[in-house]
């Protein structure tokens, strides 16, 4: 079957008219008109060639029509993939097998599979129907339409249709464009068993040109990496120093000899509660110094009951004292005891009784 293209058809043309026009040269299987062009399927190839020779530029309803072989067929529709081929099979034997269904343009065997290019798409379809899942030289081969444009060997067709860049003149395995779409500066090594092999890495960790880039990828795991104790202590001290500078920078600088001597002293009492003097008032400074001297004696004494000197216990009748510094001294105890020795106020009992009995 041959498909013919008819162009520049007049509006008055009908399918029946076109069919009868081409049936003069052979059997017409199908006729379709689409707007100002159409397609005619003729069974015999010789009849199609005669129709093209006689009807091209034929005047129909005052318009010259164009008749030629249809060129809109897909290139992949004539390419067959033949799998599970016997290792003893040759190209000539496989070509002869497929020529039973039509002319074969090319036949190439690659290991246990092959690619066969038929001249016509209808012949390729007939070959699939007749040879798929059939025995050939002791093996059951599988025939189907090929959808791959990959050229795995120089002998498989012309150097056209690279599936990576779409340009002609080279096979895909020799294409300068890598799989990511960028131009590669090396020739990709082809592995027959596993396909294309990725080139090995040439740079180690940290040697990339983008490794030290300020705008590159962030290291989110830097805080979790193990660091030495000295590094951690130094980082903590630096952060504390920076925090103190930021928070104390707005406070005025106090220049005082008392404060300087206190800070420079090597023996600093942690319980000392001296108040910082004001540099603007000398009297206030003196008062603070006196208060500090008084409070230092209070905080400086030994407050442990075990190391304290034993107090003299008072005798009976002298009251209870709590040491020489207590307010309950012996004199106060004697004054308190004398109150019990005073004569009580005595009333006249009979007078009061007579007053209450009058009522």
UniProtKB/Swiss-Prot annotation:
Principal location: nucleus
InterPro entries: Euk_RNA-bind_prot (IPR050502), Nucleotide-bd_a/b_plait_sf (IPR012677), RBD_domain_sf (IPR035979), RBM4_RRM1 (IPR034897), RBM4_RRM2 (IPR034898), RRM_dom (IPR000504), Znf_CCHC (IPR001878)
Keyword Hydrolase: no
One GO term of the biological process aspect: circadian rhythm
Domain of life from the UniProt record: Eukaryota
Region (Interaction with TNPO3): 196-359
Residue span, RRM domain: 2-72, 78-148
Annotated Pfam families: RRM_1, zf-CCHC
Function summary: Required for the translational activation of PER1 mRNA in response to circadian clock. Binds directly to the 3'-UTR of the PER1 mRNA.
PANTHER family: HETEROGENEOUS NUCLEAR RIBONUCLEOPROTEIN M-RELATED (PTHR48025:SF26), OS02G0815200 PROTEIN (PTHR48025)
Protein name, as recorded: RNA-binding protein 4B
Source organism: Sus scrofa
Gene: RBM4B
């Amino acid at each position: 079957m041959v498909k013919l293209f008819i162009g520049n058809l007049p509006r008055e043309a009908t399918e029946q008219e076109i069919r009868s026009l081409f049936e003069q040269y052979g059997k017409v299987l199908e006729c379709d008109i689409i707007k100002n062009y159409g397609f005619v399927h003729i069974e015999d190839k010789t009849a199609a060639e005669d129709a093209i020779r006689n009807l091209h530029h034929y005047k129909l309803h005052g318009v010259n029509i164009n008749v030629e072989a249809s060129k809109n067929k897909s290139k992949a529709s004539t390419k067959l993939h033949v799998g599970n081929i016997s290792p003893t099979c040759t190209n000539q034997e496989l070509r002869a097998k497929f020529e039973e269904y039509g002319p074969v343009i090319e036949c190439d065997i690659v290991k246990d599979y092959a690619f066969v290019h038929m001249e016509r798409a209808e012949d390729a379809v007939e070959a699939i129907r007749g040879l798929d899942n059939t025995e050939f030289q002791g093996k059951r081969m599988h025939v189907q339409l090929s959808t791959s444009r990959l050229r795995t060997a120089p002998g498989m067709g012309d150097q056209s249709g690279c599936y990576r860049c779409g340009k002609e003149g080279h096979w895909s395995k020799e294409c300068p464009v890598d799989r990511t779409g960028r131009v590669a500066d090396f020739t990709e090594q082809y592995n027959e068993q596993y396909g294309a092999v990725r080139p090995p890495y040439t740079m180690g960790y940290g040697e990339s040109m983008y490794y030290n880039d300020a705008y590159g990828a962030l290291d989110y795991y830097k805080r979790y990496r193990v660091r030495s104790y000295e590094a951690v202590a130094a980082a903590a001290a630096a952060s504390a120093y920076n925090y103190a500078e930021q928070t104390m920078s707005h406070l005025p600088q106090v220049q005082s000899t008392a404060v300087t001597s206190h800070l420079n002293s090597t023996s600093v009492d942690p319980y000392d509660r001296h108040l910082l003097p004001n540099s603007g008032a000398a009297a206030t400074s003196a008062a603070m110094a006196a208060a500090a001297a008084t409070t230092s004696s209070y905080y400086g004494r030994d407050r442990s009951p075990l190391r304290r000197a034993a107090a003299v216990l008072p005798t009976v009748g002298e009251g209870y004292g709590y040491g020489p510094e207590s307010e309950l001294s012996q004199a106060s105890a004697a004054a308190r005891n004398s109150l019990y020795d005073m004569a009580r106020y005595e009333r006249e009992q009979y007078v009061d009784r007579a007053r209450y009995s009058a009522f």
